[in-house]
């Protein structure tokens, strides 16, 4: 039995929720998010709370309800406050510059990397070695940050590369003769 599924999701002020069958749409100041949930889960709105509960006779209903509750919580927080991921560039000559919906990266390749931001994601560069990815969709923000990090993941010997701001890179010692 899922403990997560038993806790209701509080709908914050300024957030509007619409339930149509298995599709839940959440509107807020940061935009609109919509998701179709598994048939094993029933989503119900009671006053200012959303509840995800399993349908009768479904084997993995509580597990699906816990997942649905977490997704609903992320949707409500996303449209009201938004999510952000911070990245840092470590390395000689590694730079980032945001130009509208495009992020230009210089990561030691023979060519600059131009990363086009998907719809609903914004990017800022407070300095040349910092990147801040923002958006309402938690999954998409994380995926964009992972894609940017994937161009040059941090290496363990010198620590060069693109890393998350809170990431700790375990360093290795160089080979000795």
UniProtKB/Swiss-Prot annotation:
Keyword Ribonucleoprotein: yes
Keyword Cytoplasm applies: no
InterPro entries, A to Z: Ribosomal_uL6-like, Ribosomal_uL6-like_a/b-dom_sf, Ribosomal_uL6_a/b-dom, Ribosomal_uL6_bac-type, Ribosomal_uL6_CS
GO biological process: cytoplasmic translation
UniProt entry keywords in alphabetical sequence: Ribonucleoprotein, Ribosomal protein, RNA-binding, rRNA-binding
Example of a GO cellular component annotation carried by this entry: cytosolic large ribosomal subunit
Gene Ontology terms, MF aspect: rRNA binding; structural constituent of ribosome
Record HAMAP family: Ribosomal_uL6_B (MF_01365_B)
Family: Belongs to the universal ribosomal protein uL6 family.
Assembly and interaction partners: Part of the 50S ribosomal subunit.
Role according to the record: This protein binds to the 23S rRNA, and is important in its secondary structure. It is located near the subunit interface in the base of the L7/L12 stalk, and near the tRNA binding site of the peptidyltransferase center.
The protein's name: Large ribosomal subunit protein uL6
